[in-house]
């Protein structure tokens, strides 16, 4: 992670007196956000309503909160309950010339984005990426038989109508200094919390929030998929590599398992090259699963990645199913009366 990025994070997530210098700009940003929201609610900007229930999973802050693991959990959960979920995503980190793009487990992450390839591999669901969420959703419906749509991110993309909004919160960093950009990390004011359907906290929740706990799984060799329990790395010095929104979370989880790591943080969606991981020694390299999809093309024998699974309370799943049933009935009534 660059010194500039680290400086910005310290500024946003600590009580820096100098933040007041940017407060007027944050006020203008917040005003623009409210005007835009008002324009959508008044019909000045068009919201596209899809014929199937739409769940949007997003956050209020810049940076990683754990959306992708939750999307994976939701896709697997819904399939277990008889649904056929389809996914759309922005495709961050991808550089395709044309969008929308369908994503498959063997797609090139440099074209469609690292998170998209990870989602395709972990869920097995049809997936389309593109900056235009509406166009991506129509492309998904044209090439799949999904009966529920999950939008990875897109909470602020009001052009796409949604039936359920799930907000993900970092349980440690929360909302930083609670200021909107650029004085703070917020994309929208904290009042937005009152309008979402469910709040999931990655870590310790507060009142009314559902706890999501993550657990690192056995390491997998990046070349052949060989499994190795993480405890087998305890007597070895390791390189920890993370190009995610909050690299320190990954490093802290490794340290909590009594692993000795030299951390190597990189920006989110970083386009890894072989020289980035050309360390002087031959000690094992442990990276996130998201980073592994980009590093496999130049992988060495000492490269391992660490999958992560999350757990949520049964009450959260029950709430999701209840909201989905309500959304489906509402759409059926609209079709019947229309």
Swiss-Prot record:
GO terms for molecular function: ATP binding; tetraacyldisaccharide 4'-kinase activity. Keywords: ATP-binding, Kinase, Lipid A biosynthesis, Lipid biosynthesis, Lipid metabolism, Nucleotide-binding, Transferase. It catalyses: a lipid A disaccharide + ATP = a lipid IVA + ADP + H(+). Pathway: Glycolipid biosynthesis; lipid IV(A) biosynthesis; lipid IV(A) from (3R)-3-hydroxytetradecanoyl-[acyl-carrier-protein] and UDP-N-acetyl-alpha-D-glucosamine: step 6/6. Its EC number is 2.7.1.130. InterPro entries: LpxK, P-loop_NTPase. Pfam families: LpxK. Disulfide bonds: none annotated. ATP binds at residues 61-68. GO terms for cellular component: plasma membrane. It comes from the Bacteria. One of its GO terms (biological process) is lipid A biosynthetic process. HAMAP family: LpxK. Belongs to the LpxK family. Transfers the gamma-phosphate of ATP to the 4'-position of a tetraacyldisaccharide 1-phosphate intermediate (termed DS-1-P) to form tetraacyldisaccharide 1,4'-bis-phosphate (lipid IVA). This is Tetraacyldisaccharide 4'-kinase. It comes from Nitrosococcus oceani (strain ATCC 19707 / BCRC 17464 / JCM 30415 / NCIMB 11848 / C-107). The lineage of its organism: Bacteria, Pseudomonadati, Pseudomonadota, Gammaproteobacteria, Chromatiales. The gene is lpxK.
